[in-house]
Amino acid sequence: MKEKELIDIWKREESVAHIHGWDFSHIEGRYTEETDLPWNYQNIILDYLKPEMKLLDIDTGGGEFLLSLRHPYVKTSATEAYPPNIQLCKETLLPLGIDFRAGDGKDMLPFDDYEFDIVINRHGDFNTKEIHRVLKCGGIFITEQV
């Protein structure tokens, strides 16, 4: 396929895609991250995550993946920096009681020292010094990157 043809295909797809947050359901059935990879990020997290743990999701997108974990909302926090997703998180996560704060994963996190038992980050920026700062002693950091 020639470059112009590919660009035309992408433009057509973009015009019909309804992307909100980190929801790419418009490509459902064409690619499945969970089955096309030799690991399952969600299962890895769930192997460690316990209901009493305090969880932070850095760069949560629209919060879809975070919500799929079904962790107690009062023990759940999230950050996001992309303006459309910030608004989406305010509308979806805050009403549930999730502690959502606008912020970029590569900068200083807007949380106290040693606040979290587990920090996750899926395809987002992160700062290892900040991860270390907000994790409790013996805490767990799990990330999946492109």
Regions found by a protein language model. Give the residues of each.
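Conserved alpha-helix/loop element of class I SAM-dependent methyltransferases that forms part
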Residues: 32-54, 64-65
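N-terminal, positively charged/glycine-rich alpha-helical extensions of SAM-dependent methyltransferases
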Residues: 1-26
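A generic alpha-to-beta junction signature in SAM-dependent methyltransferases
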Residues: 49, 70, 134-135
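Class I SAM-dependent methyltransferase SAM/SAH-binding core
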Residues: 54-108
